[in-house]
Amino acid sequence: MGIRQMSNLQQRIIAALIGVPILLFCILYSDYTFLGLFLIVGALAQLEFYKLVGSMGDNLPLTFYGTFCGIVLHLLTFFIEKGDVGYQNYYILSPLLTLIFFIKLYKSKDEKPFKNIAYTFLGIIYVALPFALLTVLAFIQDDKYDPNIVMGCLFLLWASDSGAYFAGTKFGKTKLFERVSPKKSWEGSIGGLVTAMVVATILGNYFTNYTTFQWYAIGIIIVVAGTYGDLVESLFKRSINIKDSADTIPGHGGFLDRFDGLLLSIPFIITFLKLVR
């Protein structure tokens, strides 16, 4: 029996057994393996986004250009946060992002250039920017690379997703946002919150650079913002009548599906930690 013929739960378990060790190794080994991992994941997620947008009628987002801008943003953020280059290098983005207007002048087949410019920028803001901000999170403590905060956030995200999945499957009756995502339930969300708080308690005892209260707060942010991140992507996918952004990761869909909860969480987590530390 092939992996695609297995149940959703079986596929999720296999994906976790393969994917989690790779993620943890890249995060723990060095800041450069961390960069390489999320640079690739971010670029693939952005490509998935543009592919979805391109499937909507006559939309023609600049896929290569948008993904290239996302990669440049990610690299700049990494080396600036690492302290290798100064913040003034962010000015590189200004002419780079402006180039899209010149490029569109030569796209004679594009009947709605400004609509597609907007979709191109949306891919940068919605997908590339949060992955770049993940680097800010990794260097948030004294400008030194801290794998613990990244791993902690991922553990909380996985705990929340798993708790929501099992609680929703077993007890889910009260719809959370039926118009957008019929399968999501309040019971599932509560289950996700409970498992996230359990993991936050454990993190508070082992990753002591942050207090247990801070881990609780980060957990709540991930549960709330992550749920809305899922709903936002569900709304987007429903508007183009698809179920998953791709089928790259068995049991989860694509990279955009797997990390959508993290995309909206990261800006709030960074803001919280900047204010309380």
Regions found by a protein language model. Name each.
Residues 271-277:
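Juxtamembrane boundary at the C-terminal end of a transmembrane helix
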Residues 2-220:
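Membrane-embedded alpha-helical bundles of polytopic integral membrane proteins
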Residues 263, 268-271:
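Hydrophobic alpha-helical transmembrane segments of membrane transport and translocation systems
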Residues 239-261:
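Interfacial loop-to-transmembrane junctions
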